[in-house]
Regions:
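DUTPase catalytic domain/fold
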Residues: 1-215
């Protein structure tokens, strides 16, 4: 795999047929395409994560299973701002719609300028081949002072990698996060089936009388 540089990114965004095109839209300024990455802007929709009275949330917790609402949707117009206080966590999204063709994979990184102020943009990092939508950004202020962030700010950067060949298994239509149009809350509860399988494997291993394997 190799990362696409400036000219290759531009060619990828004009590629024909359209199914093989890298889509990052709207691109408000051509200068967002850097030497080996594309700067992404912060969108207008946010989900503020509320604290719960109970202590934990997880795939098998009551909140996860019952789908209890614990996030508030906030809409900020382009050029408007949101205060992110120390220790606060919100879900945001990119302004740009992204579509990754089957022969490319994306990596999303926070920008150093924001990190030096205490803003962590802990995205899911990897964009699978075949994925499309606006990207959810997990924004957290780990600094000591409130941060004023604006809808439309350059918030992250997209690095695009060329696969050795087109994948036969692109991001599936039945996957958890398909074509989102705004910040999406966690769907960890959909992984409970995997937890049940792990429990059964553990029970079978204990049934053989030996200790669980160590790595």
């Amino acid at each position: 795999m190799s990362a696409l540089q400036h000219e290759e990114l531009e060619r990828g965004m004009r590629a024909q047929p359209v199914s093989e095109r890298l889509v990052v839209s709207p691109l408000l300024d051509q200068s967002q395409i850097g030497p080996a990455s594309i700067d992404l802007r912060l969108g207008t929709h946010f989900r503020e994560v509320r604290r719960l009275e109970r202590g934990v949330v997880g795939a098998e917790s009551e909140a996860g299973v019952a789908g209890e609402r614990r996030e508030e949707l906030i809409v900020v117009p382009i050029g408007g701002h949101l205060w992110l206080h120390p220790g606060q966590f919100v879900l945001g999204s990119t302004l740009e719609y992204i579509r990754m063709p089957d022969h490319l994979v994306g990596q999303v990184l926070g920008r150093s300028s924001w990190a030096r102020l205490g803003l962590i943009v802990a995205t899911s990092v990897l964009i699978q081949p075949g994925w499309s939508g606006v990207l959810t950004l997990e924004l957290s202020n780990i600094g000591d002072v409130p941060l004023q962030i604006y809808a439309g700010d350059l918030i992250a950067q997209l690095v695009v990698w060329q696969l050795l060949g087109k994948t036969d298994h692109p991001y599936a239509a039945g996957a958890k996060y398909v074509a989102p149009i705004g910040p999406e809350e966690s769907r960890l509860e959909l992984e409970t089936g995997d937890r049940e399988r792990l429990k059964r494997v553990g029970e079978r291993m204990r049934g053989h009388g030996g200790p669980l394997p160590r790595h």
